[in-house]
Protein backbone atom coordinates (compact mmCIF):
# COMPACT_ATOMS: atom_id res chain seq x y z
CA UNK A 1 0.00 0.00 0.00
CA UNK A 2 0.96 3.63 -0.46
CA UNK A 3 1.21 4.06 3.31
CA UNK A 4 3.99 1.46 3.48
CA UNK A 5 5.78 3.04 0.52
CA UNK A 6 5.57 6.37 2.33
CA UNK A 7 7.01 4.81 5.50
CA UNK A 8 9.94 3.25 3.61
CA UNK A 9 10.71 6.60 2.00
CA UNK A 10 10.60 8.25 5.42
CA UNK A 11 13.11 5.73 6.78
CA UNK A 12 15.55 6.41 3.94
CA UNK A 13 15.21 10.17 4.33
CA UNK A 14 15.43 10.14 8.13
CA UNK A 15 18.52 7.91 8.04
CA UNK A 16 20.19 10.22 5.52
CA UNK A 17 19.37 13.32 7.59
CA UNK A 18 20.77 11.64 10.71
CA UNK A 19 23.95 10.82 8.77
CA UNK A 20 24.27 14.47 7.75
CA UNK A 21 24.35 15.48 11.42
CA UNK A 22 27.12 13.07 12.43
CA UNK A 23 30.86 13.40 12.00
CA UNK A 24 31.56 9.67 12.14
CA UNK A 25 28.94 8.33 9.77
CA UNK A 26 30.28 4.76 9.85
CA UNK A 27 29.02 4.37 13.43
CA UNK A 28 25.43 5.37 12.69
CA UNK A 29 22.93 2.52 12.71
CA UNK A 30 19.20 3.03 12.17
CA UNK A 31 16.18 0.75 12.30
CA UNK A 32 12.71 0.40 10.87
CA UNK A 33 10.07 -2.05 12.10
CA UNK A 34 7.14 -3.34 10.00
CA UNK A 35 4.44 -5.04 12.06
CA UNK A 36 1.36 -5.60 9.92
CA UNK A 37 0.32 -9.27 9.96
CA UNK A 38 0.54 -12.19 12.36
CA UNK A 39 0.80 -14.84 9.61
CA UNK A 40 4.41 -15.75 8.84
CA UNK A 41 3.61 -16.36 5.16
CA UNK A 42 2.57 -12.73 4.76
CA UNK A 43 5.87 -11.56 6.23
CA UNK A 44 7.66 -13.08 3.24
CA UNK A 45 5.32 -11.27 0.87
CA UNK A 46 6.08 -7.97 2.59
CA UNK A 47 9.80 -8.80 2.55
CA UNK A 48 9.82 -9.30 -1.22
CA UNK A 49 7.72 -6.21 -1.81
CA UNK A 50 10.00 -3.99 0.30
CA UNK A 51 13.11 -5.43 -1.37
CA UNK A 52 11.71 -4.71 -4.83
CA UNK A 53 10.58 -1.22 -3.85
CA UNK A 54 14.03 -0.38 -2.50
CA UNK A 55 15.59 -1.48 -5.79
CA UNK A 56 13.19 0.83 -7.63
CA UNK A 57 14.18 3.72 -5.36
CA UNK A 58 17.88 2.98 -5.91
CA UNK A 59 17.38 3.30 -9.66
CA UNK A 60 15.55 6.61 -9.30
CA UNK A 61 18.26 8.08 -7.07
CA UNK A 62 21.06 6.90 -9.36
CA UNK A 63 19.34 8.52 -12.34
CA UNK A 64 18.82 11.76 -10.44
CA UNK A 65 22.42 11.91 -9.23
CA UNK A 66 23.68 11.36 -12.76
CA UNK A 67 21.41 14.09 -14.10
CA UNK A 68 19.38 11.73 -16.27
CA UNK A 69 16.12 12.58 -14.49
CA UNK A 70 14.62 14.25 -11.43
CA UNK A 71 12.54 11.20 -10.50
CA UNK A 72 13.97 10.92 -6.99
CA UNK A 73 13.19 14.54 -6.17
CA UNK A 74 9.61 14.02 -7.35
CA UNK A 75 9.30 10.71 -5.48
CA UNK A 76 10.56 12.03 -2.14
CA UNK A 77 9.35 15.65 -2.24
CA UNK A 78 5.99 14.98 -0.59
CA UNK A 79 7.50 12.70 2.06
CA UNK A 80 10.18 15.25 2.90
CA UNK A 81 7.69 18.11 3.23
CA UNK A 82 5.14 16.20 5.30
CA UNK A 83 7.46 14.36 7.68
CA UNK A 84 9.95 16.95 8.84
CA UNK A 85 9.78 20.28 10.63
CA UNK A 86 10.95 23.56 9.16
CA UNK A 87 14.03 23.44 11.42
CA UNK A 88 15.01 20.02 10.08
CA UNK A 89 14.49 21.15 6.49
CA UNK A 90 16.51 24.29 7.07
CA UNK A 91 19.46 22.30 8.43
CA UNK A 92 19.11 19.47 5.89
CA UNK A 93 17.79 20.88 2.62
CA UNK A 94 16.59 18.43 0.00
CA UNK A 95 19.47 18.84 -2.43
CA UNK A 96 22.05 16.68 -4.19
CA UNK A 97 24.09 16.31 -1.01
CA UNK A 98 21.12 14.79 0.81
CA UNK A 99 20.36 12.67 -2.24
CA UNK A 100 23.92 11.30 -2.12
CA UNK A 101 23.48 10.45 1.56
CA UNK A 102 20.24 8.67 0.69
CA UNK A 103 22.19 6.67 -1.89
CA UNK A 104 24.74 5.81 0.81
CA UNK A 105 21.92 4.59 3.06
CA UNK A 106 20.53 2.40 0.29
CA UNK A 107 23.98 0.92 -0.35
CA UNK A 108 24.10 -0.21 3.27
CA UNK A 109 20.48 -1.21 3.90
CA UNK A 110 19.28 -4.68 4.86
CA UNK A 111 15.89 -6.34 5.30
CA UNK A 112 15.23 -9.20 7.70
CA UNK A 113 12.34 -11.40 8.72
CA UNK A 114 11.98 -11.45 12.50
CA UNK A 115 9.91 -14.57 13.05
CA UNK A 116 10.31 -18.31 13.59
CA UNK A 117 11.16 -18.86 9.92
CA UNK A 118 13.57 -16.03 9.21
CA UNK A 119 15.50 -18.15 6.65
CA UNK A 120 18.82 -16.66 7.73
CA UNK A 121 17.84 -13.13 6.79
CA UNK A 122 18.87 -11.72 10.17
CA UNK A 123 22.39 -13.12 9.84
CA UNK A 124 22.63 -11.70 6.33
CA UNK A 125 22.09 -8.10 7.50
CA UNK A 126 24.01 -8.02 10.78
CA UNK A 127 26.76 -5.92 9.19
CA UNK A 128 24.33 -3.51 7.52
CA UNK A 129 24.01 -0.07 9.09
CA UNK A 130 20.36 0.52 8.19
CA UNK A 131 18.05 -2.39 8.99
CA UNK A 132 14.37 -3.07 8.31
CA UNK A 133 12.73 -5.80 10.40
CA UNK A 134 9.46 -7.49 9.42
CA UNK A 135 7.59 -9.67 11.89
CA UNK A 136 4.87 -10.07 14.49
CA UNK A 137 5.05 -12.21 17.62
CA UNK A 138 8.81 -12.04 18.09
CA UNK A 139 8.55 -8.27 17.88
CA UNK A 140 6.11 -8.34 20.80
CA UNK A 141 8.64 -9.73 23.28
CA UNK A 142 10.12 -6.52 24.54
CA UNK A 143 12.90 -6.01 21.98
CA UNK A 144 14.37 -2.51 21.94
CA UNK A 145 15.70 -1.20 18.62
CA UNK A 146 18.38 1.45 18.91
CA UNK A 147 17.74 4.48 16.71
CA UNK A 148 14.32 3.24 15.67
CA UNK A 149 13.37 5.98 13.22
CA UNK A 150 10.35 4.46 11.47
CA UNK A 151 7.66 2.14 12.79
CA UNK A 152 4.90 0.81 10.52
CA UNK A 153 2.44 -0.71 12.96
CA UNK A 154 -1.03 -1.69 11.75
CA UNK A 155 -1.70 -4.97 13.56
CA UNK A 156 -3.57 -4.98 16.87
CA UNK A 157 -4.38 -8.09 18.97
CA UNK A 158 -7.90 -9.38 18.52
CA UNK A 159 -8.43 -9.80 22.25
CA UNK A 160 -9.20 -6.64 24.18
CA UNK A 161 -7.26 -5.59 27.24
CA UNK A 162 -3.98 -7.29 26.34
CA UNK A 163 -2.09 -4.85 28.53
CA UNK A 164 1.15 -6.81 28.86
CA UNK A 165 1.53 -7.24 25.10
CA UNK A 166 0.80 -3.59 24.44
CA UNK A 167 3.32 -2.39 26.99
CA UNK A 168 5.94 -4.76 25.55
CA UNK A 169 5.30 -3.28 22.13
CA UNK A 170 5.92 0.16 23.57
CA UNK A 171 9.46 -1.00 24.40
CA UNK A 172 10.26 -1.08 20.70
CA UNK A 173 10.41 2.63 20.77
CA UNK A 174 14.06 3.17 21.71
CA UNK A 175 13.68 6.87 21.03
CA UNK A 176 16.11 9.59 22.08
CA UNK A 177 15.42 13.30 22.28
CA UNK A 178 18.50 14.16 20.23
CA UNK A 179 16.86 12.78 17.09
CA UNK A 180 13.18 12.87 18.10
CA UNK A 181 12.40 15.25 15.24
CA UNK A 182 13.22 12.47 12.75
CA UNK A 183 10.99 9.77 14.24
CA UNK A 184 7.65 8.69 12.78
CA UNK A 185 5.11 6.07 13.81
CA UNK A 186 2.74 5.02 11.03
CA UNK A 187 -0.35 3.39 12.50
CA UNK A 188 -4.14 3.37 12.56
CA UNK A 189 -6.39 5.69 14.53
CA UNK A 190 -7.51 2.80 16.75
CA UNK A 191 -3.97 1.83 17.71
CA UNK A 192 -2.99 5.46 18.29
CA UNK A 193 -5.95 5.89 20.64
CA UNK A 194 -5.02 2.73 22.56
CA UNK A 195 -1.42 3.83 23.10
CA UNK A 196 -2.59 7.31 24.12
CA UNK A 197 -4.79 5.65 26.74
CA UNK A 198 -1.87 3.57 28.04
CA UNK A 199 0.38 6.62 28.21
CA UNK A 200 -2.13 8.44 30.39
CA UNK A 201 -2.47 5.60 32.93
Residue ranges of model-derived segments:
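Conserved P-loop NTPase catalytic core
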Residues: 1-21, 67-71
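Short alpha-helical segments and helix-capping/turn motifs at coil-helix boundaries
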Residues: 10-22, 96-97, 135-139, 170
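Long, hydrophobic alpha-helical segments
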Residues: 192-201
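Short secondary-structure transition/capping segments
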Residues: 75-79, 158-160, 200-201
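The feature primarily captures lumenal catalytic ectodomains
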Residues: 12, 16, 28, 200-201
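Conserved C-terminal RecA-like helicase domain
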Residues: 20-132
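Conserved RecA-like P-loop NTPase helicase motor core
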Residues: 111-193
Amino acid sequence: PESLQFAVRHFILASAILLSKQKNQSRIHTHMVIHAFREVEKHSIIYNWVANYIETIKGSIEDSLSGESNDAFVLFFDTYNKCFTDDVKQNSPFDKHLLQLMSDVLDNIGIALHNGKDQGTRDSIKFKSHQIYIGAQLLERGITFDRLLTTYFTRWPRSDGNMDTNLQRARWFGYRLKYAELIKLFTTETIADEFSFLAEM
